[in-house]
Amino acid sequence: MRLSRYFLPILRENPKEAEIVSHRLMLRAGMIRQEAAGIYSWLPLGLRVLQKVAEIVRQEMNRAGAIELLMPTLQLADLWRETGRYEAYGPEMLRIKDRHEREMLYGPTNEDMITAIFRSYVRSYRELPKILYHIQWKFRDEQRPRFGVMRGREFLMKDAYSFDVDEAAARLAYNRMFVSYLRIFARMGLRVIPMRAETGPIGGDQSHEFIILAETGESAVYCDAGVLNLPIPDETIDYDGDLSPIVKQWTSLYAATEDVHDAERFALETTEGQRIETRGIEVGQVFFFGDKYSKPMNANIAGPDGVERPFQGGSYGVGVSRLVGALIEANHDEAGIIWPASVAPFKVGIANLKVGDAATDAACEKLLAALEKAGVDVLYDDSADRPGAKFAKLDLIGLPYQAIVGPKGLAEGKIEIKTRASGERVELSLDEAIERLIAS
């Protein structure tokens, strides 16, 4: 992609309204534009990251055996009345009426709707287990939206829902999603800690929030430092096997959000040098809620004995748009963003230091063509900006590699490759640079 044909509205100054690093850098890097309090347009650079984050989530959900569908953003109020949640949810729910005066709402979550879908089609335990998921925009009318996409009113979520014949089977589904979450976040280069948490308005008797430790986090968290060194399951994980040892390993050490934190237990179960008391960013949460929705909605299935019973269920959310902000909070320096390669909007940024010079232009064109042919995402800065501005721009938007091409280096048959994360610079021939960037 040539920058001259791209839309990248870089801001030169730090936006005054941005309170945290991720919000400031997303605005400066031309990733988002605020349209109203807590509501953003995703501009091309930001959308590329959002799509890559969503694709990793999708791949790991599919790997774990979940099945994708798509539910609407608008829901009927009557559906929520069946479970008693319409009145109980509070002012965060945006309630509307259509032209026929039917009460509707902009969905903050989808447990009620997915239960209605399930009861319409599934009748027997023989059709179970099932895990269904979707990736969809949601709306919660936060009283004080802040921190950019970290606490917006409109946001993109992945929600999965499990359906099982009994509690034992439902707990297995919980473990399956728990393990898949470890993989999702690890693929993005994030160290995330599952912590015991309140179930809140979703309900149920078991929940874990997946937390990134960060001083800019919204809530206090407490954990044993040992959780930072636990192994992540690799791509060979067998989701049909026994996952309980992995879950037990990750939940045996103390880790809790402030809502369920027990100071006495924390002191007993950890040593002084191992205690971490800090703040955290929630990027996902899993719930086991049993028959909380199936029972009031009469979503019953016939068991092996022929007797009908409510299905046992769970709910599993990942904040896709929030993850973009969390990734920046975890990966930045004074110059800008440092994207992990798996979610970077482009892998390589090419800086042409003398646009109009025949040799420099030709080298850049060869580099661009070779990388794009190999399937590498490239942003080619072919603008007339001075070199310093180009370097600052590439550092700000955080692409993993920068290919710096100018007459001085080319006179010696070299171009420079800079690795954004380490700052390492190496001079290579054009062909060597192409080979290295494709292989990286």
UniProtKB/Swiss-Prot annotation:
Keywords: Aminoacyl-tRNA synthetase, ATP-binding, Cytoplasm, Ligase, Nucleotide-binding, Protein biosynthesis
Keyword Lyase found: no
EC top class, as a word: ligase
Signal sequence residues: none
Record-level GO BP terms: prolyl-tRNA aminoacylation
Swiss-Prot/TrEMBL catalytic activity: tRNA(Pro) + L-proline + ATP = L-prolyl-tRNA(Pro) + AMP + diphosphate
EC id: 6.1.1.15
GO MF entry, a single one: ATP binding
One Pfam family, short name: tRNA-synt_2b
Compartments (UniProt record): Cytoplasm
InterPro entries, per the entry: aa-tRNA-synt_IIb, aa-tRNA-synth_II, aa-tRNA-synth_II/BPL/LPL, Anticodon-bd, Anticodon-bd_dom_sf, Pro-tRNA-ligase_IIa, Pro-tRNA-synth_IIa_bac-type, Pro-tRNA_synthetase
Keyword set includes Transport: no
Main location: cytoplasm
Highest taxon, organism lineage: Bacteria
GO annotations of cellular component type: cytosol
Family assignment from sequence similarity: Belongs to the class-II aminoacyl-tRNA synthetase family. ProS type 2 subfamily.
Description of how the protein assembles with itself and partners: Homodimer.
Protein's job: Catalyzes the attachment of proline to tRNA(Pro) in a two-step reaction: proline is first activated by ATP to form Pro-AMP and then transferred to the acceptor end of tRNA(Pro).
Record-given protein name: Proline--tRNA ligase
Biological classification of the source: Bacteria, Pseudomonadati, Pseudomonadota, Alphaproteobacteria, Hyphomicrobiales
